[in-house]
C-alpha cells in the first residue's frame, strides 16, 4: 500500500496541485480541517476518563490541573517557557496524578534498562494488500487536510513548497520502510500539529531531533515504561487544548479566505461537510468503513466538483444573486 502511495505522489508531481482548489475549495477545506480536531475531542475526554458512567474525582482533578496549566501557560509564559507550555503542563499533571495516587510504577521496576523493540518479519499477502488499498484514499484525504492546517499554522503553503508530492511520498515511503521491519504503517498525526500550534516551534531540525531521541528512548526499557505511566487524564488534558486548536485552525481558513456565505454553494457546501462529519454517519465498502472527517472530506470533494461543473455551465443561482 505504501508503494502504491508513492506512485500516487508521482502522479500528483506530474499533474500539480491546482485540482485541490477545485475539489477542496476553502468552503469545504475549512470545515474538513475543523473536523480533524472536533472529531478527536471525544477521544480526549475518553482518555481523561470523563465519559465513564461513574467519573473518578481524581481523574477530574488531574485533568483540570493539566488543562489549566496548558491554557494559562500558553497565554502567560514568556521567553523560553513560552516554547514548552505543553511539557510544563504534562509535568504538572503528572505531579497531580502522583499526589492523587493514580500512578503505577510496578512495570517500571520490572523492566530492563536495555530492551530491543519487538520486530516482526514482513509477510507478503496480496489479499491483505488489496483489502487495505482503498484506505489509501482515506490516508491521502487526511494527509491533505493535515498539510493545509499545518500551512496555516506555520504561515507557508506546504502544498507548493516543498510540495504535496514530496510530503505524500515521505508519508508512504516511511510506511514501506516500517512494513519491511514488521512495524505498523506510519501516518500524519493531528496531535503533533496541535503541539506546533501551541509551542510555535516549526523547525524541521527540532522535529527530526525529537524523532531521533524517540528512537533512542525506545531501546531504554525503563524509560519506555516510565513514559507509559503517564495517566489518561494528563493525556486527555493536553489533547483537549491541542484538538481545539486544530478545530480553530479550520475556522481560520474560512476567515482568511474570506468565504462569501452570501453564495448558496458556499453555505451549502460548508453545512453538508460539517453535518456529515459530526452526525456519526458511516458508509461501508466491505471491510472498509468511512466515517467522520474522512467521509466528510470525500463528500465535500464530490459536492465541490459537482458545484464547479454546474457553475461552469452557468446553472447556479449564485450568478443571479451576484
Per-region residue spans from a language model:
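Hydrophobic, membrane-embedded alpha-helices of multi-pass small-molecule transporters
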Residues: 57-66, 84-85, 100, 117-148, ...
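Intrinsically disordered, low-complexity non-transmembrane regions of multi-pass membrane transporters
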Residues: 105-118, 153-159, 167, 306-322
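Flexible, active-site-adjacent loop/turn segments at secondary-structure boundaries
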Residues: 106, 112-114, 162, 179, ...
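Residues in well-ordered beta-strands of folded domains
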Residues: 117, 196, 277
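Membrane-embedded helical hairpins/re-entrant loop segments and their flanking transmembrane helices
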Residues: 134-204, 321
Amino acid at each position: 500500500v505504501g508503494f502504491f502511495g508513492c506512485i500516487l505522489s508521482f502522479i500528483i508531481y506530474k499533474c500539480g496541485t491546482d485540482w485541490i482548489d477545485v475539489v477542496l475549495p476553502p468552503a469545504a477545506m475549512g470545515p474538513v480541517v475543523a473536523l480533524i480536531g472536533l472529531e478527536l475531542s471525544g477521544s480526549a475526554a475518553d482518555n481523561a476518563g470523563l465519559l465513564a458512567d461513574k467519573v473518578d474525582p481524581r481523574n477530574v482533578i488531574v485533568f483540570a490541573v493539566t488543562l489549566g496549566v496548558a491554557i494559562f501557560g500558553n497565554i502567560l509564559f514568556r521567553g523560553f517557557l513560552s516554547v514548552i507550555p505543553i511539557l510544563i503542563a504534562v509535568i504538572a499533571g503528572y505531579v497531580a496524578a502522583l499526589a492523587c495516587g493514580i500512578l503505577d510504577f510496578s512495570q517500571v521496576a520490572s523492566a530492563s534498562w536495555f530492551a530491543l523493540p519487538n520486530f516482526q518479519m514482513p509477510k507478503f499477502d496480496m489479499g491483505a494488500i488489496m483489502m487495505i488499498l482503498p484506505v489509501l484514499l482515506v490516508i491521502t484525504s487526511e494527509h491533505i487536510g493535515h498539510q493545509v492546517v499545518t500551512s496555516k499554522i506555520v504561515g507557508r503553503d506546504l502544498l507548493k513548497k516543498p510540495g504535496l508530492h514530496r510530503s505524500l511520498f515521505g508519508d508512504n515511503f516511511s510506511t514501506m520502510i516500517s512494513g519491511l521491519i514488521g512495524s505498523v504503517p506510519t501516518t500524519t498525526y493531528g496531535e503533533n500539529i496541535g503541539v506546533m500550534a501551541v509551542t510555535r516551534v516549526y523547525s524541521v531540525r527540532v522535529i527530526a531531533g525529537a524523532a531521533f531521541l524517540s528512537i533512542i528512548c525506545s531501546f531504554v526499557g525503563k524509560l519506555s515504561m516510565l513514559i507509559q505511566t503517564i495517566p489518561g487524564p494528563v493525556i486527555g488534558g493536553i489533547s483537549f487544548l491541542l484538538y481545539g486548536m486544530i478545530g480553530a485552525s479550520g475556522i481560520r481558513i474560512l476567515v482568511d479566505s474570506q468565504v462569501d456565505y452570501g453564495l448558496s454553494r458556499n453555505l451549502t457546501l460548508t453545512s453538508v461537510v460539517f453535518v456529515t462529519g459530526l452526525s456519526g454517519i458511516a458508509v461501508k465498502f466491505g471491510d472498509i468503513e468511512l466515517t467522520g472527517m474522512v467521509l466528510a472530506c470525500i463528500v465535500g470533494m464530490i459536492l465541490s466538483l459537482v458545484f464547479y461543473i454546474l457553475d461552469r455551465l452557468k446553472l447556479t443561482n449564485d450568478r443571479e444573486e451576484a
